[in-house]
């Protein structure tokens, strides 16, 4: 995705934090980056950085760099951060495009990424528990690996002037602008219902008024 949108990319700056998830994600990125020997991997490691030092490092990134936002919850000082940390990083790199493999920063910073295609697995886990209970002799592993899906933020795509059609695979667009009807469906139907009630009330009132006028001369 990155090379399709930015073919001149030479550096990938990967951001990960000081948690098990961050370390695991960094190990996966290191492994996958071996498939792209022409790209230089710059590690923004939360085990060696605080939020302040990593912001300074981001400001010093070389040209033709793309940021890959893994996760950021805990820094080297074991300080816990919410979304404000990634906002600070975003403000430090306004001209550098960012992507994510984890959905972190998607919707306000990252343009898109390849994300896990999560689904409800409660039923599958229950069936597997029943199977293990009924067939204890079956020691085989019946694992289902969750796949991935390509996602793009439609607002960021428009902001950066990108064209999803250049991608050689299907992509899901999120945060697409909704129509006036979709945004105010409840209010529109409520107004229509109120209008119908008022019209019916008016018709009934006029009907009874006409009956009164008709009956008056006969008195």
Give, region by region, the residue ranges found by the protein language model.
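Short hydrophobic alpha-helices and adjacent helix-cap/hinge residues
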Residues: 1-211
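Residue-level detector of conserved catalytic or cofactor/ligand-binding positions
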Residues: 210-218
């Amino acid at each position: 995705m990155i090379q399709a949108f930015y073919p001149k990319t030479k550096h990938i700056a990967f951001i990960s934090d000081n948690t098990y998830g961050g370390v695991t994600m960094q190990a996966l990125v290191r492994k996958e980056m071996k498939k792209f020997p022409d790209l230089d991997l710059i590690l923004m490691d939360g085990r060696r950085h605080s939020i302040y030092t990593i912001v300074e490092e981001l400001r010093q990134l070389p040209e033709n760099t793309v940021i890959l936002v893994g996760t950021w919850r805990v820094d080297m000082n074991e300080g816990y951060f919410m979304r404000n940390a990634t906002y600070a990083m975003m403000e430090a790199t306004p001209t550098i495009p960012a992507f994510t493999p984890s959905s972190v920063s998607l919707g306000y910073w990252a343009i898109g990424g390849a994300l896990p295609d999560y689904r409800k697995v409660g039923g599958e886990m229950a069936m597997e528990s029943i199977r293990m209970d009924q067939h204890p002799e079956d020691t085989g592993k019946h694992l289902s690996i969750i796949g991935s899906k390509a996602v793009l933020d439609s607002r960021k795509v428009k902001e950066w002037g990108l064209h999803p059609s250049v991608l050689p695979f299907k992509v899901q667009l999120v945060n697409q602008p909704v129509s006036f009807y979709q945004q105010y469906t409840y209010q529109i139907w409520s107004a229509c219902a109120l209008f119908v009630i008022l019209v019916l009330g008016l018709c009934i009132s006029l009907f009874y008024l006409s009956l009164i006028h008709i009956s008056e001369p006969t008195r």
